[in-house]
Amino acid sequence: FRGLAKLLKIGLKSFARVLKKILPKAAKAGKSLAKSLADENAIRQQNQ
C-alpha cells in the first residue's frame, strides 16, 4: 500500500507539471476559439 501511495504521489506531481505546461496554451486556444465564435455570431446577426 505504501509503495502504491508513493507511486500515486509521483504520478500526480508529474501530471500537475504537465498540466501547468498545457493549461496556458489551452486557455489561449479557448479564448481565441470563443472570440471567433462570437465574431461569427455577430456577422450572422448583421446579415439577417
UniProtKB/Swiss-Prot annotation:
Disulfide bonds: none annotated. GO terms for cellular component: extracellular region; membrane; other organism cell membrane. It is found in: Secreted; Target cell membrane. Keywords: Antibiotic, Antimicrobial, Cytolysis, Hemolysis, Membrane, Secreted, Target cell membrane, Target membrane, Toxin. One of its GO terms (biological process) is killing of cells of another organism. One of its GO terms (molecular function) is toxin activity. Coiled coil: none annotated. The keyword Membrane applies. It comes from the Eukaryota. Its main location: secreted. Belongs to the cationic peptide 02 (oxyopinin-2) family. Disrupts cell membranes, particularly those rich in phosphocholine, through formation of pores. Has antimicrobial activity, hemolytic activity and insecticidal activity. This is M-oxotoxin-Ot1c.
